Amino acid sequence: MLMPKRVKYRREHRGKMRGRAKGGTEVAFGEFGLQAQAASWITNRQIEAARRAMTRYMKRGGKVWIKIFPSKPYTAKPLEVRMGSGKGAPEGWVAVVKPGKIMFEIAGVSEEVAREALRLAAHKLPVKCKFVKREENGGESNEN
């Protein structure tokens, strides 16, 4: 599972997910990418499930880049505990994803294989996604 090696503080504020992604909105490493269409928290378990679905479909061929990292801790209180008495214990790690962010990239496989692998990965994620291709001039084409 992905998680930071060490953090300065064990607990963080939840924050707001306003606006679009500032960086990472173009296919940089691979040929095809999976782009988020909405804002969401994506847990380290969801990232791992999506990665497994992609690599299993591609039969270990090609290369996969994971462009998001779960660096934000989220907390939860135990069941049947009354309100108050402090913030809950750290429960897991999430990556904050905003609209436009490329989450996964693939290279070394055909477009049909990449499209299906990224479709399987998108089903593991709690956010609506779009398949994008790298353009020759450096950007990506927004074809669905």
From Swiss-Prot:
GO molecular function: rRNA binding; structural constituent of ribosome; tRNA binding
Family from the record: Belongs to the universal ribosomal protein uL16 family.
NCBIfam families named in the record: rplP_bact
Swiss-Prot/TrEMBL keywords: Ribonucleoprotein, Ribosomal protein, RNA-binding, rRNA-binding, tRNA-binding
GO BP terms, alphabetized: translation
GO CC annotations, alphabetized: cytosolic large ribosomal subunit
Pfam families hit by this protein: Ribosomal_L16 (PF00252)
Subunit composition and interactions: Part of the 50S ribosomal subunit.
Gene, per the UniProt record: rplP
Source species, domain of life: Bacteria
Keyword RNA-binding: yes
Biological source species: Bacillus cereus (strain AH187)
Protein name: Large ribosomal subunit protein uL16
